[in-house]
Amino acid sequence: MPLTWHRPESPSLASYSNCWRLSPGAELVQDRLAHKLDVARGTVVRYFDLLESLFLIHRLPAGSRNLTKRQIQRPKVFLIDTGLNAALSNMDAAHLSSMQGADHLGPLLEQFVVCELLRHQEWSATPFKLFHYRDRQGAEVDIIVETPAGIIAVEVTSTAAATARHFQHLKALRDRLGDEFLAGIVLTTSTGQKAGDRLESLPVSSLWSR
């Protein structure tokens, strides 16, 4: 009887993208993902390179040249199309506006803001780079916009108004960077207001209405 050999099935590209479908903006830990999918780490690297070349995902790098060396260096991963992400996850407007959907709305809104800023890079008169920030003491900022003149730090919240908690890490970054810190902005789902020296909240709609 002839021996037969069955090649083990490799996870599909969908398996990789699905890892960020329900948790957009999660940090990429390649070893952990390789273990979860039962593949070699090199396979994870190749698949993510392919997903990125197909413009299905974006890896938001950690840190910036102006920040501390205490920061964690893992990138965050976002699916490029927020609407597709919501549709594949069966999350409609009714769900996202409900109490049960509150935990999903925040990450989706952060994903949307990152994708909008990526589009802005194509036509902005001021060149800028995008990063995220998290250090070993737990300080975290959703998005760092690095311009030639300095840094703009951005937090994203699905709440209608920003509170002192939303500005906590922005203030710490402002005090650490001094004049290099241009602004700290909390993007909300409603109106904005001033919140101190170089700090303010703005509606998400300001990304395309200003």
Where are these regions (language model features)?
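Short beta-strand/turn micro-motifs composed of small residues
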Residues: 134, 157, 187-188
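Hydrophobic/aromatic residues located in beta-strands of well-ordered beta-sheets
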Residues: 130, 183-184
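Arginine/glycine-rich "motif VI" loop of SF2 helicases in the C-terminal RecA-like domain
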Residues: 122-123, 172-180
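Short beta-strand-loop-alpha-helix junction that forms the active-site gateway
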Residues: 156-164
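Switch/connector loops and helix/strand junctions flanking conserved nucleotide-binding motifs
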Residues: 86-87, 163-164, 193-197
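Short glycine-/polar-rich loops that comprise or flank the Walker A/P-loop
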Residues: 149-150, 179-183
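Accessory nucleic acid-recognition modules appended to NTPase machines
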Residues: 1-151
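Domain-level recognition of nuclease-like catalytic cores that cleave nucleotide substrates
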Residues: 189-210
